[in-house]
Amino acid sequence: MSFKKAQSHFFLKNPERVRSLQKLSKKIGIKFSKVEYYNTAFIHSSYKNENQEILEDNERLEFLGDSVLGLVAARSLFRKYPKANEGELSRIKSRIVSTPILNSISEKLELSEYLLLGKGEKNSLGKGRRKLSANLFESLVGAIYLDQGFEIAEKFILRHLSEFVENPEKEESVRDYKTQLQEYSQKHFKILPIYRTKSESGPDHAKTFQVVVRIRDQWEASGSGVSKKSAEQNAAKELYNRIRKKT
């Protein structure tokens, strides 16, 4: 059985899957011609390994989508910044196609809702969730490119990426520093960061929180914000950047 027929066979046996991808089609404003591409775009390798009827996962589409995404970003930056040199363009490009930004777009589109993931992977998935989410956007781009061509794929990408092309510094606002600090701490120190609310001031409608984050007795930083969550993010950002500079 060919790849296309096998994937279509699996797809047609699952009416819920059909409805799910129809929902995706409406959400992204693209009428699918070859639905099997989009189905495959959301098949994780762990799901393929647990289901013998699945012959292809989304890794090839992810590879293709990454290349299409890179080309679209490069073309846009080349036009937007005519005086920027190669090094400057490369630095901006790496920021706007980074995991935090692609993850934020993927979350906005709720792409994980369409993901077919193996049972074992569901249980073990933790720190790689952001990367997995970003990869889904790339595999979707790969599917759109194969199904609709470069022009439609480019329009889709720019619909979601143009704000970062216009303002690359906006990448900073989508970074989840708590997650990054946690991942770094687990990898290098084998321990989780500890957060403590140091102070809480101001009236109920305009409170300011001061939070301290610590990794062992070796590293510590503080941050403030209008909520505990934002204060923790700011403290995590301060400590993460400090550690990365010194290690």
Curated annotation (Swiss-Prot):
Q: Which InterPro entries is this protein grouped with?
A: dsRBD_dom (IPR014720), RNase_III (IPR011907), RNase_III_dom (IPR000999), RNase_III_sf (IPR036389)
Q: Name one GO cellular component term.
A: cytosol
Question: What SMART domains does this protein map onto?
Answer: DSRM, RIBOc
PROSITE patterns cross-referenced by the UniProt entry: DS_RBD, RNASE_3_1, RNASE_3_2
Q: Can the keyword Cytoplasm be found in this entry's annotation?
A: yes
SUPFAM superfamilies under this entry? Answer: dsRNA-binding domain-like, RNase III domain-like
What this protein needs as a cofactor is: Mg(2+)
A GO biological process of this protein is: mRNA processing
- Main localization of the protein? cytoplasm
CDD domains from the UniProt entry: DSRM_RNAse_III_family, RIBOc
Q: Which Gene3D superfamilies match?
A: 3.30.160.20, Ribonuclease III domain (1.10.1520.10)
What sections of the sequence does the record tag as coiled-coil?
none
Top-rank taxon of the source lineage equals: Bacteria
DRBM domain: which residues? 176-245
Q: Where in the cell is it found?
A: Cytoplasm
Entry EC number(s): 3.1.26.3
Q: In which residues is Mg(2+) bound?
A: E62, N135, E138
Keywords of the record: Cytoplasm, Endonuclease, Hydrolase, Magnesium, Metal-binding, mRNA processing, Nuclease, RNA-binding, rRNA processing, rRNA-binding, tRNA processing
Q: What is this protein's function per UniProt?
A: Digests double-stranded RNA. Involved in the processing of primary rRNA transcript to yield the immediate precursors to the large and small rRNAs (23S and 16S). Processes some mRNAs, and tRNAs when they are encoded in the rRNA operon. Processes pre-crRNA and tracrRNA of type II CRISPR loci if present in the organism.
For this protein, the record's HAMAP family field holds: RNase_III
The name on file for this protein is Ribonuclease 3
Species, as recorded = Leptospira interrogans serogroup Icterohaemorrhagiae serovar Lai (strain 56601)
Q: Which gene encodes it?
A: rnc
